């Protein structure tokens, strides 16, 4: 696992995941563009990197490995809650991270009520796990 120090970018989105993606993309490419503008099977949010942050949806259902197999990304970036560091992981590291820090929830009834996995809120245990492997 590697880390990338992120550049500061004025916030354009209330949604934390969209802001995390935009900050990471700006750091990596210098571009400021609309977040969530690519389907998850397109290979990644920025190049071959799928970018996530705390409380992000990991996958529909509970099969993380199946999602990894079809999402098209080669690397996974977790942006910390202060938007200052992105932890860059390969698929095996991402699977371990998502398995440890994912939780099963349901979509709202208005959205069909399907089961999905989300990352937990960032806490001390998650931060220590990331730092120990970076």
Describe the function of each predicted region:
Residues 1-134:
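Nucleic-acid endonuclease domains
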